[in-house]
Structures are given as C-alpha cells and as structure tokens.
C-alpha cells in the first residue's frame, strides 16, 4: 500500500535509505582506512584538512597529536561507528578523490533513481541530509552507476551545516534554509531516532524499511513506513 503525501520538498537520508549500509561499511570504510595516512601527509596544508585535524585534536584533548595519532583516532572512530564531524569531513575528502579517479562508484537501490527523477520532474525539491559530509554527498550523487544525479538535488546538509541528526533543532535549521513550512517537508530515513527528531520539528516522515538493513527488525515505531521508494506517492497540491 502506497503512502500519499502533499508536500513541496523531500529530504533524503543516504545510508540504509537510498543506498545499502553494507556498501558503505564494506567498500567505503576500508577505502578510507587505506587513504587517511596519505591525505594527512600530502594535503596537510589544505585548509579543510588542517581544520579537521584541529577538530580531531580538540576531541582527543591532545593539541600536539601528530599525523600518526590522528590517523589512529580516525580508524578507532570508524570501528565505533562514531559520527564525529572531522571524521566525516576527512572521509568525504578521501571518497571525493576516489570517485574522481574512478576508483569508486556509488550505490543506489533500484527503486530510488526512478523515484527521484519522477519527483524532480513533478517539481518536488530534493535535498539530502546525511551524517556523511557535503563533499561526500556531492561525490556520491555525481558518481552513481546511472551517471551524474547531482542536478536532481537542490541542497546538501550534514552535521556541520545543519547539526546532529537526532536533534529537532537540526531539522528546524534545514527548514529555515529551504524557506518551506515544516509540514511541507517529507523526510525519508531508516533510523527511528532521526524520524522522531524530524517529526518533533514539524516535518512529515516515512521510515524506509529494507530487508537486511540494520534497523529493519527494529522498525520505525508509529511513523508511516515503506519498503521502497515505490511505496511513496507524492501528489503536490496545485492550489
């Protein structure tokens, strides 16, 4: 049964929603580990790298931590699945390089791209909100198996420019940036805590439940749910 929504904007989670968590864990995380060391040494003068390294040192409480110590911390945070902003920033830079070199191609579930194209063609504004950095999101959508999907997406949000994904204030920040009433925004995610935070900010929500994903068995509580994007219908009001 399809859920029908009269909304103006859709905000998408990536991992577990548009794309397989297994791909991120099994492909992207190992790639990050293999490239962190080179990134920290070869691009140490890059302002974005330097800022992220400073944030790592601050989180560690070790202002003099060298590149080896920083790399060790990044890998430990990966092991713990910690959503630390500097980790996500540096991952995004590493992945962007990999996508640009053709060493990486992103993953989307088969039902996702047709839905995104249809919604975009119908005038629905599409945005992304992920714990992955904006740089990583940009590379992800640009390097899909079906080509560059970035033209479909109007805005990219992460934990740095919006805030933590389980805090309602982050969703209010995004709504303000969109200039859209909260009840005209639909958030798609597989994570109950994120869905709860979005709803607390006044957004509409759908929990995307895909077999094999980490939150599939847990469910999404009393949120509307869909097993694929094909189970979500958007019928925008013309009034």
Curated annotation (Swiss-Prot):
It is an enzyme of class 3 (hydrolase). InterPro entries: Enolase-ppase_E1, HAD-like_sf, HAD_sf. Binds 1 Mg(2+) ion per subunit. The keyword Hydrolase applies. It comes from the Bacteria. It catalyses: 5-methylsulfanyl-2,3-dioxopentyl phosphate + H2O = 1,2-dihydroxy-5-(methylsulfanyl)pent-1-en-3-one + phosphate. Bifunctional enzyme that catalyzes the enolization of 2,3-diketo-5-methylthiopentyl-1-phosphate (DK-MTP-1-P) into the intermediate 2-hydroxy-3-keto-5-methylthiopentenyl-1-phosphate (HK-MTPenyl-1-P), which is then dephosphorylated to form the acireductone 1,2-dihydroxy-3-keto-5-methylthiopentene (DHK-MTPene). This is Enolase-phosphatase E1. It comes from Streptomyces avermitilis (strain ATCC 31267 / DSM 46492 / JCM 5070 / NBRC 14893 / NCIMB 12804 / NRRL 8165 / MA-4680).
């Amino acid at each position: 049964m399809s859920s029908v929504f009269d909304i103006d904007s859709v905000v998408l989670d990536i991992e577990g929603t548009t794309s397989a968590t297994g791909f991120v864990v099994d492909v992207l995380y190992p790639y990050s580990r293999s490239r962190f060391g080179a990134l920290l040494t070869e691009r140490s003068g890059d302002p974005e790298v330097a800022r992220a390294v400073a944030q790592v040192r601050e989180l560690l409480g070790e202002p003099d931590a060298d590149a080896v110590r920083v790399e060790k911390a990044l890998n430990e945070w990966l092991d713990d699945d910690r959503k630390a902003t500097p980790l996500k920033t540096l991952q995004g830079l590493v992945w962007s390089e990999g996508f640009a070199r053709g060493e990486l191609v992103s993953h989307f579930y088969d039902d996702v791209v047709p839905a995104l194209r249809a919604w975009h063609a119908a005038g629905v504004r599409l945005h992304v909100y992920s714990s992955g950095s904006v740089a990583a999101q940009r590379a992800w959508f640009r390097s899909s198996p079906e080509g560059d999907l970035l033209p479909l997406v109007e805005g990219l949000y992460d934990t740095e420019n919006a805030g933590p994904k389980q805090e309602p204030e982050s969703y209010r920040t995004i709504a303000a940036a969109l200039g859209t009433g909260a009840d005209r925004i639909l958030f798609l995610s597989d994570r109950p805590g994120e869905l709860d935070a979005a709803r607390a900010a006044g957004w509409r929500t759908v929990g995307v439940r895909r077999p094999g994903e980490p939150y599939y068995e847990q469910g999404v509580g009393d949120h509307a749910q869909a097993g694929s994007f094909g189970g979500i219908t958007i019928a925008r009001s013309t009034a």
